[in-house]
Amino acid sequence: MSSKHREDHLKRGSDVSPYESLFAGSVSGGVARAITAPLDTIKIRLQLQTKSHKHPHTQKVSALNVVKDLLKNEGVIALWKGNVPAEILYVMYGAVQFTTYSALSKSLSQMEKDYSIVMPSSVHSLLAGVGAGIASTLTTYPFDLLRTRLVANKKKNLLSMTGTFRKILHAEGISGLFAGIRPAMISVASTTGLMFWSYELAREFSSEYKHVPFIEGICGFVAGATSKGITFPLDTLRKRCQIYSEVYGTKYKSSLRIFMNIVSREGVLGLYRGYGVSILKTAPTSAISLWTYEYVISATRHYRLSKPLV
């Protein structure tokens, strides 16, 4: 595809229809998940590990230890535990995220025009990204929780998504499907806002290299690493909230209490369990997702323009 078709479809003022955003976002989410699924499983397992200062002889948990233990006790297929709800999650999340971002970006641009407001591009991207993160979380959260519960299962026999869903409803009610949604909302909204903000900054700084292959992916990699690096503790808190009832046998109550429990028992570093794997997973995921989104829109437009009328 020639360079003239590779414009930034996420920048302020970009004319992308809701249908284009919906389709390209769905594809980008599905592709990103399919490629990075094993890293996501390892990251979640690390985040769900608990360790107390009162037991200093406890073996240090590393990504390598998690992989060895997982392969030994559960088999290779365990690297894809929770993949069905995760694929649904990523496809839906990508669709809602990019569609909402595009719509909010247009609304913000119109508001700036109507009220003669001059908003920095970085603030524009940040606000639209935060809104996109909130909308995506509200839409897909039950699938995120199901994915976490399935990955947390360390038995060799895989749990079914429907069985886990019924178990949550029976033991915790509808509210159980939204356990931990408040820290999740803060985590995802801030991560998404920072991702779009840093992506647009990276695109601006790399404008003279726009003909470099995969430049969108490179900027997406930077955006993913930046956003996750800042908000990772909130992601850990979200995961702990999601499995609270499974671990302690009681309904999830307070994210603040869980946060204080992590810090008191494991120290501040407990909030960063799985950080290295998370960056290794999130940065490529953002790179693939953003590049795929940009490419799908460019490719579909190029196809429509080159397709002869009948």
UniProtKB/Swiss-Prot annotation:
InterPro entries: Mit_carrier (IPR002067), Mitochondrial_sb/sol_carrier (IPR018108), Mt_carrier_dom_sf (IPR023395). It is a multi-pass membrane protein. It holds the Pfam family Mito_carr. The keyword DNA-binding does not apply. SUPFAM superfamilies: Mitochondrial carrier. One of its GO terms (molecular function) is thiamine pyrophosphate transmembrane transporter activity. Keywords: Membrane, Mitochondrion, Mitochondrion inner membrane, Repeat, Transmembrane, Transmembrane helix, Transport. Gene3D superfamilies: Mitochondrial carrier domain (1.50.40.10). One of its GO terms (biological process) is mitochondrial thiamine pyrophosphate transmembrane transport. The chain crosses the membrane at residues 16-32, 88-104, 117-141, 173-197, 218-234, 274-291. The keyword Transport applies. GO terms for cellular component: mitochondrial inner membrane. It is found in: Mitochondrion inner membrane. It comes from the Eukaryota. Solcar repeats lie at residues 16-107, 120-205, 211-299. Belongs to the mitochondrial carrier (TC 2.A.29) family. Mitochondrial transporter that mediates uptake of thiamine pyrophosphate (ThPP) into mitochondria. This is Mitochondrial thiamine pyrophosphate carrier 1.
